[in-house]
A protein has these predicted regions:
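Glycine-rich phosphate-binding loops of nucleotide-dependent enzymes
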Residues: 2-247
Length: 247
């Protein structure tokens, strides 16, 4: 069974068709890239999948169930995680406390700041930090982290909910080449360990063709290519429209 099934999704803003009849599926464990220039509809498509937007036509199925009635929070609890181009963390809390809060939220429970001093989730939070290579920064304020480490922290926050599907919006934006490859190697390793599917947007073609097992290409809201990286790289329309663009 497909983990994610997107069927003929449509979403317009005024007269602009941001997502225009997009259909595709993802299997558990797949690592796929969604590419296209700014304005192609990538973020809108992610917002339709995670519940921040409602489609005007079409539907999204997750593990065979329609997501129509699910809020964004419910989709997170059911196994759809997301990271953003601009990392969303609590800057004034420690790295460990950030993950403790994420673990509590995954359980549908609120924590006060005082609770973090004794909360039993500290051990689980430490384990997540070890998975993303941040255990040595556990007691540091999130605001003190280097940019690449902030992206790792956001990944740990997303993993706290044990997602079966992780949507990643430009995970390596702003990183040097070595940082990009290190982060993507970590993501692929973590996905393989849990059979988690990953769908990521990315402008760096070295990342796309170095790590995606499948590439989907959007143009003006339409899916114009979908296949293994070698086939997409050889597609003449994709070459003409996108592969020379890095912004």
């Amino acid at each position: 069974m497909n983990l994610l099934q997107v069927e003929r999704l449509h979403r317009s803003f005024g007269g602009v068709r941001a997502v225009d009849g997009v259909s595709f599926t993802l299997m558990a464990g797949e690592i796929a890239a969604l590419i296209g220039p700014n304005g192609a509809g990538k973020s809108t498509l992610f917002n339709l999948i995670d519940g921040q937007l409602t489609p005007q036509a079409g539907r999204v199925l997750f593990n065979g169930e329609s997501l129509t009635a699910w809020s964004t929070a419910e989709r997170t609890r059911r196994g759809i995680g997301r990271t953003f181009q601009v990392a969303q963390t609590f800057a004034t809390l420690t790295v460990l406390q950030n993950v403790q809060l994420a673990l509590a939220a995954a359980e549908g429970r609120a924590l006060g700041i005082a609770d973090l001093l004794w909360d039993l989730r500290a051990e689980a939070a430490s384990s997540l930090l070890a998975q993303v290579g941040l255990q040595q920064h556990a007691s540091d304020a999130a605001a003190s982290l280097a940019y690449g480490d902030i992206k790792r922290l956001e990944l740990a926050l997303a993993l706290a909910a044990k997602p079966r599907l992780l949507l990643m919006d430009e995970p390596t934006a702003g990183m040097a080449a070595a940082e990009r490859f290190a982060l993507m190697q970590m993501i692929v390793r973590l996905a393989g360990a849990s059979n988690m599917a990953v769908l990521f947007t990315e402008h760096s073609m070295d990342v796309v063709f170095g790590f995606a097992r499948r590439v989907l290409v959007l143009s003006r809201g339409r899916l114009i290519a979908d296949g293994v990286p070698e086939a997409v790289r050889a597609d003449t329309e994709v070459q003409r429209l996108y592969l020379g663009e890095e912004a």
